[in-house]
Amino acid sequence: MSDWDTNTIIGSRARAGGSGPRANVARSQGQINAARRQGLVVSVDKKYGSTNTRGDNEGQRLTKVDRETDIVKPKKLDPNVGRAISRARTDKKMSQKDLATKINEKPTVVNDYEAARAIPNQQVLSKLERALGVKLRGNNIGSPLGAPKKK
């Protein structure tokens, strides 16, 4: 037999005649375990790459803290931010509970942010900014939040 006699089929027709196991995507842990019990080849790969998600850099900071030898204090909220939150909330005649329900957080979270006890979370701060209409990050903390910039 020469090289010209053997057929190499690549692509979707490679399994002609139903020979060999088909590659499946297991959707649950039970399906993976069933395949392992049957002795099939199992490759568990996590799929990455969603379009509009950004990683939280808090994990990087925690890794840095783990590698440090001396004690590192956690980030705390600036007291000016807490005062700005409480001032804007009272100007809008809202209770802490009302503000918490408006931003879908617990009232204790709002209380911690107003008392400047909370570890700053960018998502919660942005929700508070939008609900109160006041800047809470960067320069000019407590100034009115401008309208979105026109493109």
UniProtKB/Swiss-Prot annotation:
Changing R89G: Decreased ability to prevent stalled ribosomes from frameshifting. The modification Phosphoserine is found at S143. Residues 85-139 form the HTH cro/C1-type domain. SMART domains: HTH_XRE (SM00530). One of its GO terms (molecular function) is DNA binding. It holds the Pfam family MBF1. One of its GO terms (biological process) is rescue of stalled ribosome. Changing K64E: Does not affect ability to prevent stalled ribosomes from frameshifting. Interacts with TBP and the transcription factor GCN4. Interacts with RPS3/us3. This is Multiprotein-bridging factor 1. The lineage of its organism: Eukaryota, Fungi, Dikarya, Ascomycota, Saccharomycotina. The gene is MBF1.
